C-alpha cells in the first residue's frame, strides 16, 4: 500500500486502481514492492500531471486500466453470450477455449499483465493465455505447429467431456432407433399397406399372428412397382441409407481434414439426423414411404457425424497430457522429472561442468537434477494405443448407458400405450429429442481442432467452394486408397473390417426381424432384447480392457476373441435345422426366450469390438490424415453394410423365411479373423509416420528428439513447420514408385 500525504489517493491493488486527478497538490508517494523489477522504499514526488523522477530507471510501469462498472458489464455481457458464440462463431470453439471469452480470472490477469509489464507497455493487443498458436515459440510450452492454425494445446478434461457427450447423445439412435424401433415400425407400416402372398386381394394381418410364418401368411408390399416382402422392406431401406452414407462421408472428408469444418459438420449432421427421427411422430400408414426416407436421412446423418467424431480420437490422444509429457524437447534419450528454470532466468555456470557437459543437449541442467529415460517409439506406441483404447471404450460405455436408460423409458411408453404404432412413433420422437438435446454439451466443450488449409488457386466461396471441396475429397480418396495399399496393416484391417462391420449391422437387424416375424414377439419384448444387449455392451466396454490385461492380449488378439464369441450367434441359429433339436422344441432359436442370452453375447462382444477396432485403426493412420482415412474406414464399414442387408433381403424374398440367412451370417462373422490375425501395430504405426512425411513433407514433431538428433533436429522441425502443407496436396505417386 502506498504511504500517502495530501488530498489525492493513489492505491495499487492486483485488480484495479484509482488514479489521481490530473491537477492537484504535490503528493509524496512511497512505493511498496510491486514486482521484483522495482526497488522497495523509493521516494517519488507527484506534481500534478507529471512525476519528478530522480532516476528514470526507477520509473514504475504504466498504471493499469481502470476496472470500472462498465468493464464488469462488458465482461458479463460477453460471458452471457458464450453458448451463442459456440454455435454462430466462425471458430465454433469450446467456451473455455475462446480467446475472446476467457474466464473472469484469466481475463483480468491477462489484461493487467499486458498493461503493467514494461515490456508490453506499448502492446495493445489482447493477450492469449495459451500462448502463441502460430509461431511455435517454445516459451509458450506448446509443441510447434505443423501448419498455420494448428491447435497444439493439450487435451483438456472438458474437451474429453465434449467427445463423450456426443457418444452419450448419438448412441441412443443406433441402439434404440436403427437397432430396434425403426425396423419394427417400418415392418409394421409396410404390413399395413401390404397384401398376402397367397391371395393378393386380402390385406395382411398382424405379424404377431401365428400363421404368418407359413407360405400362406407371407406378406408383400409394392414399392416403386416392385414386389417386396414386408420383412425385407426395412433391410432394403438400410442398404440404401448406408450406400448414401458412404458417398456422403467421402464428400465431406476433405472439409473435415482441411480448415475449420470438422466440428461444424458434426453438429450439422447431428441436428439434421435428430430432426428426422423426431419427425416420425407425423408418419402414418399412408406416408410409410416417407418413413423410409426419414430412416435413410437419419441413418446417413448419424454415420457421417460418427465418422467426424472418430476423426477427433487420434487428435485427442496425440495431444493428451500423458503423451505430451514424454519429453520431446529434452535431451535425446533423457528428460528431467521436473521443469527447469524459466528462460528469462540467468544461467549460472557450475564449476563442476566438464567436457561431457556439451553432450547433454541444449537444455541446462542443475547439479544433481534427476534424469529419467524417455520412452522409445515402441513404448510410446503401446501407451498411445492403450490410452486410445481407454478413451474409445469409455465413450462406448457412456453411449451404452444412455441407450440402456432410454430403452427402459421406451419399454415403459410401449406398455402404457398398448404397443401400437402410435406408441412406437412417440418413442422415436423421444429418441430424436435426446439426440438433439445432449449434442449441445458437445457443441460447447469440443474444440474444433482445425486441419491444414486446403490449397486453392483463388479465394472461392459459396457453391464453388463446396464443389471444389467435394472434387478434392474424391481425388484425395483415390490417392488415399493408393497410399493405403502401401500400408500392409491398414489393408489387412480394412479387409477384415469390411466383413466384420457388415456382420455386426446385418446380425442386429436380422435378429430383430426374426424375433418379430418368426417368434412373434411383442414390441416391448423386442425392446427387452435391446435392454439386455445394451447392458451387456456396457459390461463389455469396461471389461474387455481388463480381460486383455489379465491374459496379456494385444489389441488384435482381443478382437479375435470377440469374433470367436460372435460366431456362436449364427451357429446357434443354424442348430434349428438339426432334426433332434427340432424334436426337442427348444434350442436353435425355436422359443422367444432364447433371444435373450444371445442378445447378452451380442452386446458383450460389440462392447469390445467397437472400442478396440476404432482405437486400433486410429493408431495405424498416418498423422495429419485422420478424416481422410476415417472416411475410408467409414466407406469400408458402411459400404459393406450395403451388401449384407440386401443379401438377407434377397434370401427372405427367395425362401419366405429368415432362418436361411444365418448361413450367410456365419460366413461373414468368421472370415475377418483371417485378416486380423496378421496385423502388427508397431509396424503399422512406423509405416504410417513414414508415409505422413511423404504426404505432407514434414518430420513428426519430436521425432528427431526421440531418435537422438537433439537440438539441431528440433530446430529443423521448427523451421519446417512454418510453411503451410496440405494433406496429399503435393504428393506425386509416380515419383514415389
UniProtKB/Swiss-Prot annotation:
InterPro entries: Atg22, Atg22-like, ATG22/LtaA_families, MFS_trans_sf. Residues 125-141 have a biased composition (Low complexity). Glycans are attached at residues 354, 419. GO terms for cellular component: vacuolar membrane. The keyword Transmembrane helix applies. Its main location: membrane. The chain crosses the membrane at residues 166-186, 232-252, 264-284, 289-309, 395-415, 426-446, 487-507, 524-544, 559-579, 593-613, 632-652, 661-681. Residues 115-154, 327-353 are annotated as: Disordered. It holds the Pfam family ATG22. It is a multi-pass membrane protein. Residues 338-349 have a biased composition (Acidic residues). It is found in: Vacuole membrane. One of its GO terms (biological process) is amino acid transmembrane export from vacuole. The keyword Protein biosynthesis does not apply. Keywords: Amino-acid transport, Autophagy, Glycoprotein, Membrane, Transmembrane, Transmembrane helix, Transport, Vacuole. Vacuolar effluxer which mediate the efflux of amino acids resulting from autophagic degradation. The release of autophagic amino acids allows the maintenance of protein synthesis and viability during nitrogen starvation. Belongs to the ATG22 family. This is Autophagy-related protein 22. The gene is apg-11.
